[in-house]
Amino acid sequence: MAAKEYDYIIIGAGSAGNVLATRLTEDRDVTVLLLEAGGPDYRFDFRTQMPAALAYPLQGRRYNWAYETDPEPFMNNRRMECGRGKGLGGSSLINGMCYIRGNALDYDGWAERKGLENWTYLDCLPYFRKAETRDAGANDYHGGDGPVHVTTSKRGVNPLFEAMVEAGVQAGYPRTDDLNGYQQEGFGPMDRTVTANGRRASTARGYLDQARPRPNLTIVTYATTDRILFSGKRAQGVVYLDGQAQITAHARREVLLCSGAIASPQILQRSGVGPGGWLRDLDIPVVLDLPGVGQNLQDHLEMYMQYECKEPVSLYPALLLRNQPAIGIEWMLKGTGIGASNHFEAGGFIRTRDDDPWPNIQYHFLPVAINYNGTNAIKMHGFQAHVGSMRSPSRGRVKLRSRDPREHPSILFNYMAEALDWREFRDAIRITREIIAQPALDRFRGRELSPGAELQSDAQIDAFVRARAETAYHPSCSCAMGYDDMAVVDGEGRVHGLEGLRVVDASIMPRITTGNLNAPTIMLAEKIADRIRGRAPLARSTAPYYVANGAPARGAKHVEHAPAPSVAAHTH
């Protein structure tokens, strides 16, 4: 049977791939094949649709690739979880639904790199707005008619949220009313990708539901990509598996690789693009020796600081089996109640030292004491702060183990490999204890359950981090944008040295952003979609944004930053 032809083949129906599939098929004469190794996102599967059930997909393999790292040398040689989404929606189908864009200086930092000058925050902000419909309405920072439904936290959901934010302010840190607005730094309510009727707002819902009826879009699920086909240095198509059958599809224009920070470098390497020595070790014909493929891997590591709650206001009763049917019925029939929230409704970003130019620590507050993946629940009323560093200098890698497309790659993050990692985690634990000790939490705060008040010395804190810190599920940067020797793609996602091939997902970030990665991944896909379509970029924003400029980390005064005329004159 002759191979079918499409203008574009997209590998991976995740946070980025669904954006591209939707935007490219807005042009009716463009045909797109969207390949997804997982299955559909079933609308009536509470595990992926109910926000409060966010831990369930991580406990199985229907929606989770369930990768595992190699023994991490600085973490007691633990093999650590690396959950990634499998199915329409990708990781937006199983993530924690925290809508955090990152700090303005993340993007300004990207733009300081040669060739990435049009990735400033003010260049990116219009694409964040384009993607978003925020329930509180549009403004200079937020959109009102985009595919991603964003819900703001409402007062009165749980007294612990407001108390934890107030405790951060009492400890001397700023208050912010919008972690995605003028000022990220500080404590405040957290936006979430949840619809108005209490359902998860994955990209399969927001984007793909628009595009699915279009005759120029073909979606194939349970399609595991084997390799990208090349004619010389030009990508010409894809070989994928349907059961045991190998199927070939050809791309007239481009192949768009959107498989995430683990699978994108894995597929490139299996296709003959990557470090030449690695490829030759597996007898893979080298299409292009590109040393950065799979390198520069980054993630956020975090700890759970858990406390007993003296008042019965936590979510502990919701963990009891006898209470769950009523929660599920209310959510199913009304879209309200405990089931309709991811319960990460407050958080914050702080600088631990005055010389940090922008926040280096993130907080997620949760009114229950439990691991992110639903394990190790404390059998009492409790609450916790997830706390972790944002820009670790440690770097890892993704390396192919075999030519078998069903075998997971070798993954090593090298967590906590640098001295700065240890300093920031020690600071974070001690600062968190100061915050929790504030008067706002007096009526709720019981004993410290984890790490435990007896752990005070650097050595004790370090031992706790080695044994208990976990991934925040933010792998990124393994096919980095740029023009240095280790860069994989240019500023439009085009793979250096090849034609007809782009990578568009979190792997192309040159440096991890400050916070959760779903919103930045959607933004960069929106931005690159315009370039693929040959459309003029959206006009650069002129919205001001906060920069600390050396202000004290505690008690800092606001300093507005707007583009200087010379910066504003830059064009894409």
Curated annotation (Swiss-Prot):
Pfam families: GMC_oxred_C, GMC_oxred_N. The active site is at 474 (proton acceptor). Its cofactor is FAD. One of its GO terms (biological process) is glycine betaine biosynthetic process from choline. InterPro entries: BetA (IPR011533), FAD/NAD-bd_sf (IPR036188), GMC_OxRdtase (IPR012132), GMC_OxRdtase_N (IPR000172), GMC_OxRtase_C (IPR007867). It catalyses: choline + A = betaine aldehyde + AH2; betaine aldehyde + NAD(+) + H2O = glycine betaine + NADH + 2 H(+). PROSITE patterns: GMC_OXRED_1 (PS00623), GMC_OXRED_2 (PS00624). The keyword Oxidoreductase applies. Pathway: Amine and polyamine biosynthesis; betaine biosynthesis via choline pathway; betaine aldehyde from choline (cytochrome c reductase route): step 1/1. Keywords: FAD, Flavoprotein, NAD, Oxidoreductase. GO terms for cellular component: membrane. The keyword Oxidoreductase applies. Its EC number is 1.1.99.1, 1.2.1.8. Involved in the biosynthesis of the osmoprotectant glycine betaine. Catalyzes the oxidation of choline to betaine aldehyde and betaine aldehyde to glycine betaine at the same rate. Belongs to the GMC oxidoreductase family. NCBIfam families: betA, PRK02106.1. PANTHER family: CHOLINE DEHYDROGENASE, MITOCHONDRIAL, GLUCOSE-METHANOL-CHOLINE GMC OXIDOREDUCTASE. This is Oxygen-dependent choline dehydrogenase. The lineage of its organism: Bacteria, Pseudomonadati, Pseudomonadota, Betaproteobacteria, Burkholderiales.
